[in-house]
């Protein structure tokens, strides 16, 4: 029984499942059919919408097509009008050009006719000229034959005589013209040179203090002399040994004289002695200490002097060793003229003259400042100061133009640049101007007397005067004894004898004057 009940239950379950499956299937079919109906409805709606859009688009396209056709027709009409107008304008222009061409053709035809007439006239004139030339040639030939018959000379001989006469006349005229041009050129060159030198000297003012070979140190009292001498002279010996100078202690009240030909050593001794006097402690150890301090102080003074000189002239970029050598020139003199001051003056003069002539003023100033740099070491190195200075400039990378100007400033080599010539001239101006250099009075008087004696020793000399502080000698000659042509020879002979017998700085101008005076009286 239980088995039957279980079987009945299982049958009922299967029925229920089948019923559920059938219901699901029916629901699925119903949903499918409903969706199909809805989809078909949407498709129909979309088709209707598409047809509506298509019809609307067709209408719009037809409208735009009609508008485009209208616009195209209007554009074609406008272009046709413009083209027709342009054609009309071109046609009018062509008609005007054609008219002008016709007018030009008429003018050309008239000119051609005129040219034909002129050609005919020219041919006639040429024939007439040819006939005249033939007549002239015939007459010329007859004249030459007649001249040859009268003069007894052939045509070639007459030509030769005429050419020789003309050549002599032309040579004479050329000689006169060349001499006039040379005189004018010399006068202009002298005038311009004097003007340039005058301007340079006016714009350059330098003061010079004559240097001596001694320095004087003032003492607070005469007792200090004994302390300077020291026990058994040990202090004075120490000072002289360390500085290389002579210390002169004499009866001069409250003063000690330092003597020496090396200005740097003399300056070191002066500074050291002044410091010792101020300190009051004078003994060999203290003297050695003060001399070392004085040496450092003088070294600083030398560098400062070199820098100030370069700055004053406007020269930059000098090697430090050249700066030191420039500073050493402050303690050097030449004929009583301070060499550093002289170098500054030469640099200024050379630069000013270079500006006036349009030359390189920077090279002229640089070479002028360094031209005597060899004098800073020439007592320590063998050789002339010119060659030493050029070697130093080359060693410390100065330009070839500067080195050449240094080498040429005393004519050791021929100056090849205008800057070298200007440095040479500036050096001569600075050295030769009155007051720049001094000599002993006795030597000065002897030199002037010697100059006049040399001039008077020549035959034909009437008077001789040494002027311009011995830098010029003016000689008056007897006109009956010396001719004008002999003046140049006499001046040269006197110059050569002066060069051989007289020592002098710079140069001496020899002027020989011959004067003839004729006197008569009107009655």
Curated annotation (Swiss-Prot):
PROSITE patterns: HD, KH_TYPE_1. One of its GO terms (biological process) is mRNA catabolic process. InterPro entries: HD/PDEase_dom, HD_domain, HDIG_dom, KH_dom, KH_dom_type_1, KH_dom_type_1_sf, Ribonuclease_Y, RNase_Y_N. It comes from the Bacteria. It is a single-pass membrane protein. Its EC number is 3.1.-.-. Keywords: Cell membrane, Endonuclease, Hydrolase, Membrane, Nuclease, RNA-binding, Transmembrane, Transmembrane helix. The keyword Metal-binding does not apply. One of its GO terms (molecular function) is RNA binding. This is Ribonuclease Y. It comes from Caldanaerobacter subterraneus subsp. tengcongensis (strain DSM 15242 / JCM 11007 / NBRC 100824 / MB4) (Thermoanaerobacter tengcongensis).
